């Protein structure tokens, strides 16, 4: 396929997902951890009706069969409840890499790796993801992304695993972080920092409270147009974050990049 076209992006994204899935499977067989692609663990071959482990699925099937990317109700890998079958699907070129620690029931395991520390590590190697959540690092495949480029990402993930497992000193692998607070990070290794962050995530239950915050949508008190008119009329004022309760935001907030 012509890699100047959208089909090329899809092919490369599928190849990268398969590579990470196969690497995860190999490490799992050795009882070792690795990252995993965020997608279904199995897909169905429409010709045979058989279920195939994702890491064994033909690339051509994944690149041409939309059913491979549908979020079906009741599947633990995506965690969404109450969705109708066939209502939504993954965009294969939005490649989410899941860090160890989030269990299929949505609970945090005793140990895990915060995605932020992975992003910081990748950033030092010049790899900048499109988005980072508590447990996932997201990359967008676009025109120009080739095996050479995503291969660099895979090598960086392998490097991270090596440095994490050996608890490499922060001064070596995250020197800017270590230099920003030398007393705080003195003598700490990469795994030390990850374990401390993970313990805080479990204790604070930040994922739970974030989910609660978005579980109930607010009641609109004013249209965006009216709020903007108030802003233009000089009727808006700056307030600190702790003073925003029961106030109407006069300036719109636009999520970017779109679709994420």
Question: What residues fall within each predicted segment?
Answer:
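Non-catalytic terminal extensions of PLP-dependent enzymes
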Residues: 3-260
């Amino acid at each position: 396929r012509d890699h100047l076209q959208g089909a090329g992006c899809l092919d490369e994204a599928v190849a990268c997902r398969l590579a990470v899935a196969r690497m995860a499977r190999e490490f799992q067989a050795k009882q070792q951890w690795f990252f995993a692609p965020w997608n279904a663990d199995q897909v169905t071959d429409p010709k045979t009706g058989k279920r195939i482990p994702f890491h064994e699925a033909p690339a051509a099937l994944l690149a041409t069969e939309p059913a491979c990317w549908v979020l079906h109700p009741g599947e633990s890998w995506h965690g969404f409840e109450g969705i109708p079958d066939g209502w939504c699907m993954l965009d294969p070129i939005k490649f989410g890499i899941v860090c160890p620690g989030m269990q299929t029931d949505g609970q945090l395991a005793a140990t895990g790796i915060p995605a932020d520390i992975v992003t910081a590590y990748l950033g030092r190697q010049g790899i900048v993801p499109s988005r980072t959540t508590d447990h996932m690092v997201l990359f967008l495949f676009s025109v120009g992304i080739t095996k050479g480029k995503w291969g660099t990402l895979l090598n960086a993930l392998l490097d991270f695993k090596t440095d994490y497992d050996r608890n490499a000193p922060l001064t070596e692998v995250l020197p800017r972080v270590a230099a920003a607070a030398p007393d705080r990070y003195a003598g700490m290794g990469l795994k030390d920092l990850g374990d401390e962050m993970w313990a805080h995530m479990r204790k604070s239950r930040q994922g739970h409270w974030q989910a609660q915050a978005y579980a109930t949508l607010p009641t609109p008190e004013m249209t965006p147009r009216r709020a903007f008119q108030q802003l233009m009329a000089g009727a808006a004022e700056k307030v600190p974050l702790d003073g925003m309760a029961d106030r109407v935001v006069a300036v719109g907030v636009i999520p970017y990049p779109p679709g994420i």
